[in-house]
């Protein structure tokens, strides 16, 4: 019996991960490439067993990743999937199950975008899940849930972080922040229901939402 040790490289094929969003509710077949993935590489060690000069067994003895696989990430449409990553109370029948302090139905929403480092008039960094309001109606820092009545478009939980002329003059009730100009154009005017949470309920989710904001360093994800 003779043993031989050998090593060979194996490719780790890239995988595709999908991110669901209702952002594309007007173009439901649209897919957006968020990140192009790449194959990884691993080094695999084997022990080969030879009997009377013939290979009779091959046993893997070690596997080490040399290059990590990077998955491809694609964003696509899914009804009722929120645009925002922020969280709040469970949604039941299209609205938060607890803590609603004020409800505004069939309100005119518009869309806007800014630079990745932009901050709203409240001082908060703008991301998906930050919106412009009339702060005399909805105070800065308020947590709210925003959705179309039919659920085909769900912006999700959002914080009042900015204002603008349209909100102050009443030509729009709320301006939803998007991370690209094209997204803001695609979703320019939408009739939405806005459910503003009371401060005690919002406070329950502050720590988790602060962590989500801190982790959100990659536009489009």
Residue ranges of each PLM-predicted region?
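Extracellular modular ligand-binding repeats in secreted and cell-surface proteins
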Residues: 1-101, 138, 211-218
């Amino acid at each position: 019996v003779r043993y031989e040790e050998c090593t060979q490289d194996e490719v780790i094929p890239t995988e595709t991960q999908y991110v669901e969003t209702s952002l594309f509710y007007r173009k439901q077949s649209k897919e957006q490439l968020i990140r192009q993935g790449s194959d990884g590489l691993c080094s695999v060690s084997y022990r080969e067993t030879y009997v009377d000069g013939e290979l009779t067994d091959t046993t893997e003895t070690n596997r080490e990743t040399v290059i990590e696989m990077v998955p491809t990430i694609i964003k696509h449409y899914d009804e009722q999937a929120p645009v925002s990553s922020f969280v709040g109370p469970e949604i039941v029948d299209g609205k938060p199950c607890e803590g609603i302090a004020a409800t505004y139905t069939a309100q005119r929403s518009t869309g806007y975008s800014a630079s990745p480092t932009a901050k709203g008039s409240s001082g908060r960094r703008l991301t998906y899940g930050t919106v412009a309001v009339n702060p005399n109606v909805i105070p800065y820092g308020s947590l709210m849930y925003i959705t179309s009545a039919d659920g085909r478009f769900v912006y999700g939980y959002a914080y009042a972080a900015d204002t603008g002329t349209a909100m102050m003059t009443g030509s729009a009730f709320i301006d939803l922040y998007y991370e690209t100009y094209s997204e803001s154009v695609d979703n320019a005017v939408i009739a939405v229901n806005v459910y503003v949470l009371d401060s005690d309920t919002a406070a329950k989710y502050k720590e988790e939402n602060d962590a989500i904001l801190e982790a959100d360093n990659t536009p489009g994800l």
